[in-house]
């Protein structure tokens, strides 16, 4: 019996993402050239950050395109994990770039080169404008799409990097302190590293089928036991195919006095959808725990368990 399901379909955000990607990608090239010409490590480090923005935007676009592909006999879950693999690659790339920037900044702090502050300022201001336009393009979709929200946050963080480079250019222009450029690069690198770790950690959690970060497992267990007609449960598993697509399977021992399919199942479905936004659910009902049940994963609402017959009710 189906326990109900819903699948999110990609929204109409392709146009905004394509425009933001075109703007960011074009300016990325200009910023690298500007960083080399002005000898500004801060500009180059900001360009490295903008590279990750470009990759993030490309991932968001690819995810929308790939999500439209139906599941097939080879990949019955579809192609959602592509987004997670790409995010993990993006995190590793960003980590390597950040380490290189910190190392290069260390070398430059010992012997600061002459910085062309005017060119550095102009390029950084252009970057700020590009980021503001990209944020405006993505703002309407970031509240309804996790893909777009991720890209929006990437652009937002790069905007902060542009502000830092502008501040550095002004300081160098009026003080001549060339070391400020390397100091700004260090700050950008230190800003990027924690984000890299969180992105990699979240990606690995999905790939290892861990409980999604936004789901409180203890609260799910509590709410299942609080559902009328549930005596106990075991083998509860919660994971995500990709961000925002949580799935749940569980074996529920029901009270013999209730009809699980007609009374308990609708309550569990509604509770999981309303409280935890989990709509991809498979539930197996039993009158007693199955022999394969893991005692460590068995949770009782009542000490009395009777019967041996089991029936299943699932959904996707």
From Swiss-Prot:
It is a multi-pass membrane protein. Pfam families: Cation_efflux. Keywords: Cadmium, Cell membrane, Cobalt, Ion transport, Membrane, Transmembrane, Transmembrane helix, Transport, Zinc, Zinc transport. Its main location: membrane. GO terms for cellular component: plasma membrane. One of its GO terms (molecular function) is zinc ion transmembrane transporter activity. The chain crosses the membrane at residues 17-37, 47-67, 82-102, 115-135, 152-172, 174-194. Disulfide bonds: none annotated. Coiled coil: none annotated. It is found in: Cell membrane. Necessary for activation of the czc determinant. Belongs to the cation diffusion facilitator (CDF) transporter (TC 2.A.4) family. SLC30A subfamily. This is Cation efflux system protein CzcD.
């Amino acid at each position: 019996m189906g326990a109900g399901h819903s699948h999110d379909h990609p929204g109409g955000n392709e146009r905004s993402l394509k425009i933001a990607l075109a703007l960011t990608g074009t300016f990325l090239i200009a910023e690298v050239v500007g960083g080399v010409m002005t000898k500004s490590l801060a500009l180059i480090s900001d360009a490295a950050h903008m590279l990750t923005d470009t990759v993030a935007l490309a991932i968001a676009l690819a995810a929308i395109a790939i999500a439209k592909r139906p599941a097939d006999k080879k990949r019955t879950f579809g192609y959602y994990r592509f987004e997670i693999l790409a995010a993990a690659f993006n995190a590793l790339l960003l980590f390597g770039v950040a380490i290189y920037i910190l190392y290069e900044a260390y070398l430059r702090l010992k012997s600061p080169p002459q910085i062309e502050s005017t060119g550095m300022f102009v390029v950084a201001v252009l970057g700020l404008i590009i980021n503001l336009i990209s944020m405006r393009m993505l703002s309407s979709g970031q509240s309804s799409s996790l893909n777009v929200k991720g890209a929006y946050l990437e652009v937002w963080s790069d905007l902060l990097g542009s502000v830092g480079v502008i501040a550095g250019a002004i300081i160098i222009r009026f003080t001549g302190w060339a070391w400020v450029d390397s100091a700004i690069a260090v700050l950008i690198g230190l800003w990027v590293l924690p984000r890299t770790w969180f992105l990699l950690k979240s990606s690995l959690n999905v790939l290892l089928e861990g409980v999604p970060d936004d789901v409180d497992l203890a609260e799910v267990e509590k709410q299942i036991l609080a559902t009328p007609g549930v005596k106990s449960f075991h083998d509860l598993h919660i994971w995500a195919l990709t961000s925002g697509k949580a799935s749940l399977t569980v074996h529920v021992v029901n009270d013999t006095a209730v009809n699980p399919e007609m009374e308990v199942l609708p309550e569990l479905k509604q509770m999981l959808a309303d409280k935890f936004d989990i709509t991809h659910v498979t539930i197996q009902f039993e009158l007693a725990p199955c022999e394969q049940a893991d005692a460590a994963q068995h949770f009782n609402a009542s000490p009395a368990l009777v019967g041996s017959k089991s029936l299943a009710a699932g959904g996707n």
